[in-house]
A protein has these predicted regions:
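The feature marks the mature, well-folded catalytic cores of soluble enzymes
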Residues: 1-172
Length: 172
């Protein structure tokens, strides 16, 4: 673990910074408004999605619950997975995703990942983030910031090689 006592960067507006950094990382952010319907917002971002997985009761647009599958290979072909983030980091737009599913592949195998995040649960930097998870007991967790991307020796950028092609964070 890094030295968490260091003075790290603090932002005047964590929400604004988070959104800007997420966009720079190739992700999308949407701030829910009081009149918004969460399922309609998801459908607006992913109108062509046929296979939407989620174990969250409020996600009525889900076509299946990944926890009910017998084999994680059945997740292959998932267009969108909808998950809850525990908190976000303004510094790098990373969201802490503790394992809330039977199979952790849910976070990586779908073409797109929608992360629901309480906008009040933003920290400034990774020092604050590590302090939040240091004493917690997680079987698995991952920080995710934007879509998966990699580049080869010729610097050809490829999205979705090791995870979702698109990541949308819906700030509630």
């Amino acid at each position: 673990m890094p030295d968490l006592s260091l003075n790290a960067i603090v932002y005047e507006d964590k929400l604004k910074t988070f959104i800007e950094v997420l966009k720079a990382a190739g992700g999308e952010a949407y701030v829910m408004q009081p009149d918004d319907d969460l399922n309609a917002v998801i459908r607006r971002f992913y109108p062509e999605a046929q296979r939407i997985g989620s174990n969250l009761n409020e996600i009525m647009c889900a076509t299946f619950n990944p926890d009910e599958l017998e084999d994680p290979r059945e997740l292959n072909g998932t267009d969108v997975s909808v998950v809850k983030g525990e908190f976000g980091v303004a510094e790098n737009a990373a969201v802490w995703l503790p394992c809330q599913y039977r199979y952790k592949a849910v976070y990586f195998i779908s073409n797109a990942l929608v992360i629901l995040l309480d906008r009040q649960e933003l920290v400034n930097n990774m020092n604050e983030a590590y302090r939040r998870i240091t004493n917690a007991d997680y079987s698995f967790g991952v920080f995710m910031s934007g879509p998966s991307k990699t580049a080869d020796i010729e610097q050809a950028l490829v999205f979705g090689a090791h995870g979702p092609i698109r990541v949308t964070v819906i700030l509630i």
